[in-house]
């Protein structure tokens, strides 16, 4: 009998997990359950610049970087959304930049600290310290649909369904359930209260000449996409509201103009807000469970809590999640 595997969530983590499982267990039947159209998900808007927040996730990021490198070499960026981009992160806090160096300095290309002449020449109001590097960015509105096309080629099915209880999926005949529900992963797990929303707002502006990313202290940034430049952001913990306010716009634009005075009054093409899945650590864990109604035994593999690093870490963490799925099936 073919193993039946359910993946909860069709964002970048769910699709990445399903793709790796499909490749590792080609005789499996995989269904991805999602509660909303992809366009309304947290994975639809990000520019996907490679950057790691915490050193504990370095090896996950290294695996993802190798995957993006493969895509960049072999497939058109117009299809994958993956491109190579250079830029800078500024801060008055030298230790925060050294932490970035420890987290991914030996993964990305050309990582280095700028000297004073470079800082003063490039930036109108430079911070005291600045790093430069080159890395891949994976645009959510292209990269995840590309993964979905690969999944359809693997005969993976998609079903829009609001899953509120894992037992109902197990009782429907699934042997393993992979919980990639993002912000709602903890609630769906039923045993995890460590998840919290990180409210994010970005604006997409018309600035085709702007080719480099630029961060200041990880909250103010500009990142070029294919047809626009993303500027942001807000990182507001434990806020659930998604409506973009004038306060949001004015705050982002004022910080942005300080970084790039030559781009005053930018033409705004699009606004986007989402709730990032905050958690102190990414959860990658398997559990044996038994349904309440029928007593059926099944395995749930939790794979959620990536915060702002879903695109950067997703391929690497999915490797670990897939190992747990194979173990659950005795493979």
From Swiss-Prot:
Coiled-coil segments on the chain, per record: none
Catalytic activity, as annotated: D-aspartate + O2 + H2O = oxaloacetate + H2O2 + NH4(+); D-glutamate + O2 + H2O = H2O2 + 2-oxoglutarate + NH4(+)
Biological process, per Gene Ontology: aspartate catabolic process; D-amino acid catabolic process
Keyword annotations from UniProtKB, A to Z: Cytoplasm, FAD, Flavoprotein, Oxidoreductase
Name by which UniProt lists this protein: D-aspartate oxidase 2
Domain of life from the UniProt record: Eukaryota
Main EC class the enzyme belongs to: oxidoreductase
GO molecular function, one term: D-glutamate oxidase activity
Family: Belongs to the DAMOX/DASOX family.
The organism of origin for this protein: Caenorhabditis briggsae
UniProt entry tagged with the keyword Manganese: no
Pfam families linked: DAO (PF01266)
